[in-house]
Every structure is written in C-alpha cells, then in structure tokens.
Amino acid sequence: ITVAFPTNILEIETINVLASKIHLNLCVENMEVLLFLEKHLESPVGVFMKIDVGYNRTGVDSDDASLIQDLLSQMSGIPFINFKGFLGHAGHSYQCRSKEAVEAVHQKSKEKIIQLKTKYKAQYPNLILSLGDTPSCSVSEDFEGIDEIRPGNFVFYDLTQNIIGSNELDAIAVA
C-alpha cells in the first residue's frame, strides 16, 4: 500500500503498526521528515520521493538536483528505508477545462518525472515512476515510461471531472 501524499509524522504510531503488518510505502519531500523517520521507524518501509511536477503545492522541485541528491544520500543510510522511486501528482490538471489542456499538463508532468529516472536509473535500477491524477488518467493514453499510474477517483467520476473534460455526464457513477 502506498500512502500517496506527504508523510504526516504525527501518524508515526499508525505507520509503525501498519509497517509491521504490510508492505507500506510512504512519500517524503523534505529532510526533516526523513530524519524523523530514521529515528522513529520500527519496521521497514518503502519510500517514494514526492516530486512537484508543476502544481507547486507539495513535493521536491524536479529541478532541485541538490535536494534530490541529499535526500537520496540520506535514505541510503537508513536501515528501515527502501527507496522505491519518484512519485508525482499533477494537481494542476484540475484547473484545466479541456481534454487538450489536461493532455498538455500530463505530458509536461511525465517529462519531468522521466528525466529523474533517466538520471538515477543506473544508481537505482529498480526505481519506480508513479504518476497520477484523475483528469490525466481519464484523458491520456500515453503513459510510456511510467511504471505505475494512480487514477484517483477515476472509477466514480463526478461533476468536477465532467467540467474538466475527463468524462461525459453519463459516466458519473456516484450521485
């Protein structure tokens, strides 16, 4: 199970309970959380580095090579952390109002995260790229280079998705 939003350190007890029972993946976007996990984890977890692919709300800027390298270096020395890869969420796709606009956001987001895999795949050959948001997963068919997609509420849809252009009204599954 991947908790696909930044790790909340106030949930460390729950994290430790879950990690002792399942294969748990967390998201990290800063050194403070990583250092906290280093001191408080009691069981192994996978860690995705949360990458900002353009929404500018959460995640490490995909161009911040120094911070990315610092986080990777720190992770490599933590016994209970297994670096899984890079994870992105194109939250800015929700501001789109056409399929073409969603596709443009998706392609740009995909490009940013794939550049990281290209840079780090020799050092981390099993690196996973995880990318997803409901609008992009609804509209785009091009996920080449992405290992895992996270379609959000794709199976239900709603009026917001209809306004964005992700679906037709008759595809809304929840009233």
Region spans (language model):
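Active-site-proximal beta-alpha core segment in soluble small-molecule metabolic enzymes
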Residues: 1-96
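Active-site anion/phosphate-binding pocket segments in diverse small-molecule metabolic enzymes
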Residues: 100, 104-175
